[in-house]
Amino acid sequence: MLLPSDVARLVLGYLQQEKLSSTCRSFILESPNLREYAEHYTDEGSIPGCVLSLFGKNLTTILNEYIAMKAKENKEEIPVMVSALWKKLDHTLSQIRSMQNCLVLPTSQKVRTRYGIQDLRHQRMLTSHAASTGSAVALQQTSTPIAAKQVMLRSFTSQSASQTIVSPLCSGQSTIQCTNSPATESKGETLQNSALSDAEKKQTSSPMRRKTDCQRRRRAAPLNSSSATHEGETEGNVDSLQDLIDGNFPQLVIENAREKILSNKSLQEKLAENINKFLGSDTATQASKLSEGGALEQYTSIDEILGLQGGEMHMSEEAIHDILEQTELDPDFQELYDLFACSSTKPTKLASRDPSLQTEGVATTSIHVANDNLEPMESSFDASVDTSHSSNHSEVGAAQKKDGRSQLVVPSPTPKVTESTGMPSKVQEMPISASERQSMSDRSVESKKSIDSVIILDNTGSDTVIESNEEVQVTSMEVGISQSQDVDMNVLHTEVIGADCQLAVEQGSLNMLTVDLTVPNLKEETPKMQTYEKASEAKKSSPLKDEVQALGSRRLERNKSEGAEGPCTTESQNIVVLVSIGSTVTESNLLNQRGDLPATPRKTDTSTETTVSEQMQAESSITSKELKVLQKQASKTPPHPMVPPISPSIKGSSSDSDGSSLPLEVSSSVGVSTPVNTSNVEQNCSDVSSVDPSQIITLSFITEDIAEDAELTKAVKSISERSNSALLLSPFHKPQESSSIVSIPGPTSETLTLLADPREVVNVSGDVATGVKPAEDCTIISLPGASNLSTDGGIIQLMPATSSSFAPSGSFFISTCNTGGAQQSNIMVVPSNCAPASTQKQPCHFQTPPRPHSVYTVGQAISPKLSQGSTFILASAVQPVLPGVMGMFPVSVVGQSSNTFTTPSHQVLHVPVSQGVPKLSLPPKSQKPVPPRTLASAAEKQGTAATTDSGNRKSSSRMQRSENVDKNLAAMSQNKPEERQTSTTNPSTKGTENHKRVLCFENTAANRGTPNTKSLCNSAAPQNKDKVETMNTSSSSLPAKQNNKDSGKADKTAPSTEANSKCESVPSKQPVVPATKDLSGDKKPVAVASSPDVLGGVMANKENMLQKENKKQELPEVSKKSSTADGAAGNLERTVQAVHETGRKHATLPSILRRTKLSTERMCPPSPLTKQASDLLQSMQFNSPNAKHFSGGDLPIPRTPGSGIDDRLVDSHQDHMKTPKSKRYPEDGGTPKPMLPPATPELPACSPASETGSENSVNMAAHTLMILSRATLAKTDGSSPLKDNTQQIKLSKNSSKKRKLDEPDEYGRRPHKKELMSPSAILKRKKMKKHRKKSTDDFPAGMDVDKFLMSLHYDE
């Protein structure tokens, strides 16, 4: 609602803007709506606080906007017409330019096609590069005779006749030109035939293929949308090119399509939906566009025709293409597309289109296509061949797709065609492509019935497009050879369908990639085609050699019709190869697309790929030679072709020249045979044939985005280019097996196993399982560390397109053999899970190939210095621990202080699952990694045995870690890595890991770090927990008491403990007193533990039943004191125990626990609880002075900020733990409480769970770590500090006795847990911390705050 005052203010604002001050003044005075302003306006007429605008717009702006709106309403529509005319002019000029490319513009489509084919052939002979790029286009142009007109549509891209305008999109198109080109070759014509016009291809292709074609077209020069119409016209219409130029489309087709759309409301709605999706334009115009677009062929012309007719030229080409794409995908529009196909093309076109479009009707369509194609082929062999080939190809692809084999079945239809054609096997293979396709379409109807489903799948997927690309290239490249190749390929393909479901699926995924790649891969297409031809030859030679010789063309035919079933193993293997070859181009495209290694796919992915890039240049010029050579090679290495089938990407493998490259088995994990040695290839072939489908792991990298990932592509390229290693899914572990599969043994051994799921261990071959023992919760990526590997394996992680930047669980790791291994790093830390350690359910094993260097330096801000192109350390799911490390090397591995860490040359990284403490769990317990600081230090001190325990303690006691980290960390971490490695490697370690010590109260056994602790010794566990609590509550007292108690407990527990205590000189001496303490402490700690108040989380002992409140209180005090003593000592003790236990072996650990349990139980049972409590109290009193002195007197004790306060805390804590007496409760109630809460809150902070939370938790954790570290420092200062501590303890015992006695009572009264957990407790703790900071005793002399902070940081 606009009020008059608003208008007045707007006007006033305008007057002020125009600086009409006098008018402003008079206006303000006279306007009834501005009376409130009259008193406030200044001489200039401005009002200080007044906003003279409406919704932020002043009068001028509002008026201008209004004018603009009005002007728009009155605007005439001339611009639309003008733009349409300009577009038409532009289109016409582009067509003229494309026609100029043709030497002659024959009036007859057939003549034009012939010229185009000849021109293409000529061009290919002349320039390899031009041939690769241009001929691909030309190939596409070459279409079935019907498609000849379509060529005109491709005016932009055609290098040969304007018809060959088909751009890289052609490759994407469903018609597989390659097969056609073979037919063309048989005729002596070039691949040009294979290049079908967009319309034709679309007709022959399934909606999916058409979609991919559209995308490709978009990428390429705008395709003529009229191509479809031209196809329709091809029957009797004028040249499609001329039609395009004249703008004469088959009016009947367009009208029919329009009528259909208009008569079907659902179609209209869907069209409108699709159009509105991309831009809200008139439905009618869009519908008309779609009707024409229905024949996706009218790309460039869509705008002209539709724009001129409908006057809707304002839609961008992109939008129209998008809409068309959307429409293509809609089955409801199938009829429309069929309309265009039928009316515009002869039955051949319709048939070909139907198979591609209608997956189910592939067989029938194939037959129709075959018949129809035969006619056009006869009339114009080149065009007809191409057309039939493309249509058949699409059919085949469709059939394949039906099977769900998204393999490139295109080749198989060709063989079928060969069969019907009855041409010689070799001739049948390629030359028959056109006729073969036709006969094949008939044949394919029969044999396709088995393969039809497979073919249909291809059509549905992008596979068809891939096929067409491959074929297009192949045809031009393999003139003579391609014939036989195609036949074999078809046969093989048929076989493959029957035998290699996985392969087919892989191919399908590859095909998907190929679709995207087709446009960009046009350049690669020719090489790929060449590769394809080579592969075909190899297949041809091997299957033809064996089969043709044995079965002859009849067998080839039978394979086509029945061979799909896999008439013979060799054949089926070869078929696989052929199929893979068929998809080889596709695969290489896929790889390129995928960004696996655009270059690598050629070299590494498949020999074909290598052949592609190498052959692209050499082959284009020497296509015939190379084809022949390839054939020879193929004959030499018949098994080799089989290998390619296993891995479509290996298609190139058929050419031995690529022998050096180990084809990546991307699509099929069956075996990749590198054509290094012909004999090897043959062996591989046999191996492949023997390979069990179950062993085939299908790694389908269908990441369309990967191709666009420049970095990944680069990395893959660099790795693969160095030396191609095969990705062997099944025999990655067994070098021999992989060598059998892969001709190159070295790369094979180094072959990285791709794990489709990082968590899954690929047991493709039984050897694999033996090679790497998957941890219970581990994923193993094993790079067979064969000594024969001269270079390190580079690991590439292919990540499926996901939102997460870190490696997803489904990511694939590709390992390649890199030369210059001397610089490569040995470390491959690849956590299988992206989830943080806490969620990490499965540890991972990573085995790295042996590497020359074992020492790695970690730069401050730089990632570890790895030789470039060596190992890709993929970021683990866990965020990088060290900023400079890129998350590859956890701090635990690298260590806090040192920039370098050593790793064994060949090692298995065991990434344990940290069940207890998420944060503590080190990403991977890599053998190299330095053990967690505290664990490392303690465990290292203890000995290798500690490693096992360290795993347990790791999670259980971060606090210990922080304590030990400072001094122990540096020395121990260095030593420990080895220990840890051993522990990690050992299965026992796993068990230990499962039983990690957690500071959490819930885990009784966690502290002990022994799996049995929880169940075996409740008493021991309570003590441990008490220790932990004590550590948290009174860190200051902990060090001294811990040492005492640890030594005592260690002595009690076992000689091993004694040895540990001996390691700690002080503890060994102290043990005598602590022993008594421990006896009493243990007795009552058990009770304490059982008492819910004290331990809460700890459950369970016989003592629990016996607990009385007094006893409970006493026990808590005693236990807490003992735990404090044990707490600090607990760390040492744990370390000692861990070391000791490890030394004793896992078997020993349980016994130690039992001993502890027994000792505690013995202690408890001998005397009544009350008696125990009194004893404990007495012992506590004796010890408490020590503890007090220790805490107060010993600087090392972190928690003694104020000797008085700390002592109280320590005393109260200890008393509380040991035996708070009801008498003392009232006395100590006041002071101890405040002290304890601070200490207690620290406990939660220490626990990983609490730390995970907020900044508060981090701060708390930091404080606890600091305190613990101080305690550790006190302990670790050396034996002397410990001794001093003992002395101090004695001194402090006397002084602290009273305080402790008082405090224990208070503590006993008040539930420690509540206080610890309560916010007030936290506040108290903070206050206590402040007090501690104030006190000089607080920081031990030797303490390095930074170090502790750093360690703290790491833990967090």
Curated annotation (Swiss-Prot):
Biased composition (Basic residues): 1323-1334
InterPro entries tied to this protein: LisH (IPR006594), NPAT_C (IPR031442), NPAT_LisH (IPR052850)
Compositional bias segments (type: Low complexity): 648-664, 917-928
Entry's Gene Ontology cellular component terms: Cajal body; cytoplasm; Gemini of Cajal bodies; nucleoplasm; nucleus
UniProt GO molecular function: transcription coregulator activity
Transmembrane regions: none
Biased composition annotated in UniProt, kind: Polar residues: 180-196, 381-394, 607-624, 666-688, 944-959, 982-991, 1004-1022, 1030-1042, 1054-1063, 1249-1258, 1277-1289
LisH domain location: 3-35
Basic and acidic residues bias spans: 1043-1052, 1107-1120, 1205-1218, 1300-1309
Keyword Glycoprotein: no
Subcellular location: Nucleus
Listed Pro residues bias regions: 638-647
Disordered: annotated span: 180-242, 379-446, 589-688, 916-1092, 1107-1130, 1180-1258, 1276-1342
Key words, A-Z: Activator, Cell cycle, Nucleus, Transcription, Transcription regulation
Pfam families, A to Z: NPAT_C (PF15712)
Domain notes: The LisH domain is required for the activation of histone gene transcription.
Protein family according to the UniProt entry: Belongs to the NPAT family.
Function: Required for progression through the G1 and S phases of the cell cycle and for S phase entry. Activates transcription of the histone H2A, histone H2B, histone H3 and histone H4 genes.
Protein name: Protein NPAT
Organism: Xenopus laevis
